[in-house]
Amino acid sequence: MKKMSSGEIRQMFLDFFKSKGHAVEPSASLIPVDDPTLLWINSGVATLKKYFDGSVVPDNPRITNAQKSIRTNDIENVGKTARHLTFFEMLGNFSVGDYFKKEVIPWAWELLTSPKWFGFDPKRLYVTVYPKDKVTKELWQKTGVPDDHIVEAEDNFWDIGEGPSGPDSEIFYDRGQQFNNVAEDDPENYPGGENSRYVEIWNIVFSELNHLPDGRFVEQPHKNIDTGMGLERLVAVIQGTPTIFETDLFMPIIKATEKMSAGKRYGVSAQDDVSFKIIADHARTVTFAIGDGALPSNEGRGYVLRRLIRRAVLNGKKLGIDHDFLYQLVPVVGEIMKSYYPQILANQQFIQKVIESEEARFRQTLDAGVTLLNQIIADLKQDGKKEIPGADAFKLFDTYGFPVEMTNEYAQDEGLQVDMAGFKKNMAAQRDRARKARGDRQSMGSQDKVLMSITTPSKFTGWTELDHKHASLQTIVVNDQLQDSVSEGTAQLIFDETPFYAEMGGQVADHGEIKAQDGTVLADVSDVQHAPNGQNLHTVTVKGKLETGQQYWLSVDPLRRKKVSLNHTATHLLDQALRDVLGEHTHQAGSLVEPDYLRFDFTNFGQVTPKQLRQVETIVNQKIWDALPITWKEMPIEEAKKLGAIAMFGDKYGSVVRIVKIGDYNTEFDGGTHPTNSNALGLFKITSESGIGAGIRRVEAVTSKEAYEYLTQQQDWLSETAENLKIDQVKNVPSKVTQLQADLKAEQKTVAGLQAKLAAQAAAGIFDHPEEVGGLKLIAKQVQVAGMNELRQLADKWKAKQASDILVLGTEVSGKANLLVAVNDTANQAGFKAGDLIKAIAPKVGGGGGGRPDMAQAGGKNPAGIPAALSEAKTVISQKA
């Protein structure tokens, strides 16, 4: 068997299948861009679904790839076993209705055993087959695998319910008894058994059957091949390491961690080794995930990242690392993987910044959290208890940022567990408190019992009309009670059909009127939300009698709808422009579309520069002026994916979705309203950009008339400034301001010089005649200086001159009092502290203060009290002495 690096092994696999006519598919992003059902890409085939389900026809039906993947269902086992990882690479070769068993089996054997390729010893290879799959067994025999190296196993059948299925065949490598964790005569000591001697290196799935809803299996007309070979395991076998962690994929990370630890070394302590392995795995995972655009947060994949980073930081603490360190491993990961993933080093600074920020955030509460957790565990052990109360686990989560899974893992290491039911109860109580704090307004997720009971359908007609003259009133709800009629007050109404848009996806609801057939206004619509069963629920202020079963004229405010629609389109253009300028790591994190402005939240670490904002703004305006047609249609979700429509993570989509397309520039899954052409927006102007949380930025902007008014207001302010500066043309304002700033700086320098002279003059006499009070020399005087800074300068001169034992100074600045007290070592030894003395005299000027034992200061609102404060200082000193 050849000795190769991990990079060479990966490349050899791809080169082999390229020689067999396969197209090399680049590794896709870890973040699924066309599959809302997945949190992460978790296998080599996950990115190829579009080919196997027939929604996209590949240019070449033979495909090979090395796909980065993340699986997080066994996080707690990472580091504690020889095989669990959260990030891994899956090597694979695939056939979409092209070749099948008689081709793939000989190829697999050739790649593994040929001296030209991996060069495995055939005697150390074993294969497993499904007992009923006689064809596969015969093909392995023809390939040269002896019968005693072919194992029949009932679990060699791939089936996930309805859909494609079929037998599979696994290939194992015999590492020898020296690598085993069970005895040679153990019943599990066979290829496919629970042992560490026989390592599975490849799985070949023969997708030849279709599992029907009635449970029957029928043969598929087009047979497919799906294979998976874990790179990390393969590298461990080829490099002859005890586990995957000793390979060149992990050891550089472990060595770098050793250098930052408190003298810890890998391979010395089993307990320390667990921490080294956890850090190495998690460093890889978070580096690649953030590189692909994921960011730490409290939900979804962001929560997974936060949990991994904090788990790594906690294990770093176990190794004696008390500073931010995980971000320093990013370039190590990048260097290891640069041959196939150069983008890690290219994006290194951004990835490091995200991790460092998250580390620093957690480290603020880490020590206190660990101390509390250790105390909880010690108390439980002393009382003979085995379960951490849910309330304590919640406190660790809510106050100290400890994911409950991490607390539970920490507890398990101590032979304890967390009361998860109690934790969930506390979480539910917190959510309930949050709901109450938000008030009683019923939201889209309202589960009110009365509304839940309403199942009458309601159709939205507002895509094509703003007036619907014959809407039948189906339901009236007043104070959570169903009624047949209403004549005043506030009510909630459901019609069989309505043009009113219900708030959704950040777009606010339509407003308007409900009228009688003669045009008499009977109610004003102030809000529309989705009822629990999907109907549009209109909140109205009633002006006339409304009755169920009657028909009414529903009229949407056309101007409000138009303005909201324009701003909604602007969010789509803004979203795309941000991706164009900042990169694909940027994605929408929230939005609000109002009639008069729009707000758009997006992921990005660091402030967006003025230059970048100008680029974004320019792109959006250019797309507006390009007069791009805006079209929308409903279509099957798979067809929408083929169009490359952007799906918002966290949103759930049915089998039929609505797609909004702005020319060829932007295509998104969307349920909002839009104009028919981008030129309807007229103008787009960003009014602010700010940070609202870790990794989340917010842009506010205006369009159309509001954008014009905003620019007009800016122009008015600029003109007013020019007038005040006595400038004829506003274009000269910047140069005039620059000149004034230079003049001001020069004047400030002059003033500072004069103040220094005044301070020197003031100091000239105040130190000359100290008085003796209580056996100590005291200088207590009111001086005329510019402020507290000058008082401190006087105190420095007093200290240098050793003019007295205690100094008390007061000055009036802008109608307020400043006091300063300084004491030397002699006064300190006599029991006088500056902080105590300042607290005693500050009330005389109507203020308070504090400071160090040798110097303290105070401020107050009553400068007239300065003489009394100085006198009080003498009294306090004389009494204490």
From Swiss-Prot:
Pfam families: DHHA1, tRNA-synt_2c, tRNA_SAD. One of its GO terms (molecular function) is catalytic activity, acting on a protein. InterPro entries: aa-tRNA-synth_II (IPR006195), aa-tRNA-synth_II/BPL/LPL (IPR045864), Ala-tRNA-lgiase_IIc (IPR002318), Ala-tRNA-ligase_IIc_anticod-bd (IPR018162), Ala-tRNA-synth_IIc_core (IPR018165), Ala-tRNA-synth_IIc_N (IPR018164), Ala-tRNA_ligase (IPR050058), Ala_tRNA_ligase_euk/bac (IPR023033). Belongs to the class-II aminoacyl-tRNA synthetase family. Catalyzes the attachment of alanine to tRNA(Ala) in a two-step reaction: alanine is first activated by ATP to form Ala-AMP and then transferred to the acceptor end of tRNA(Ala). Also edits incorrectly charged Ser-tRNA(Ala) and Gly-tRNA(Ala) via its editing domain. PANTHER family: ALANINE--TRNA LIGASE, CYTOPLASMIC, ALANYL-TRNA SYNTHETASE. HAMAP family: Ala_tRNA_synth_B. Consists of three domains; the N-terminal catalytic domain, the editing domain and the C-terminal C-Ala domain. The editing domain removes incorrectly charged amino acids, while the C-Ala domain, along with tRNA(Ala), serves as a bridge to cooperatively bring together the editing and aminoacylation centers thus stimulating deacylation of misacylated tRNAs. This is Alanine--tRNA ligase. The lineage of its organism: Bacteria, Bacillati, Bacillota, Bacilli, Lactobacillales. The gene is alaS.
